[in-house]
């Protein structure tokens, strides 16, 4: 069962779903909550290694370069580029609440994928959601910290 906006607000009031900062009314849909893009990105620098070795988790960190986008400036996602980002909001789920992250259709229609595979947030999860951003399109796209980037259902 997916919670309605009324149920989501009730669960927030009860503390079963905790989101900070508090959300303005326009971020609530009929059965979802919109989260905004944060200012922190991790850019993959593929030229540092011949391949990614999944058995070497430290090696993955070694090929990423953190970038913080200044307020009011865009992060330009190039065609076929893949980066990691985080949401502006911090989410905490009770031990009996599951969250699902979905990209916004307005972004999907221009080729922006918000998550590749990791859309499930287990009960008890806490933190800022990591976004797996990819531009499948043929043109660069300017993404602005603070813009609505994804929706959560519970």
Whereabouts are the PLM-identified features?
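DUTPase catalytic domain/fold
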Residues: 1-154
């Amino acid at each position: 069962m997916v919670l309605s906006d009324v149920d989501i607000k009730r669960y927030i009031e009860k503390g079963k779903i905790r989101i900070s900062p508090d959300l303005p009314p326009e971020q609530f849909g009929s059965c979802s909550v919109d989260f905004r893009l944060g200012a922190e990105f991790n850019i993959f620098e593929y030229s540092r290694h011949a391949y990614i070795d999944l058995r070497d988790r430290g090696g993955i960190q070694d090929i990423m370069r953190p970038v913080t986008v200044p307020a009011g400036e865009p992060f330009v996602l190039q065609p076929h580029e893949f980066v990691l980002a985080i949401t502006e909001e911090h989410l905490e789920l009770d031990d009996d609440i599951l969250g699902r992250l979905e990209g916004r259709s307005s972004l999907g229609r221009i080729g922006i994928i918000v998550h590749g595979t990791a859309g499930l947030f287990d009960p008890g999860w806490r933190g800022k959601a990591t976004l797996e951003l990819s531009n499948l399109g043929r043109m660069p796209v300017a993404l602005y910290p603070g813009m609505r980037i994804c929706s959560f259902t519970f």
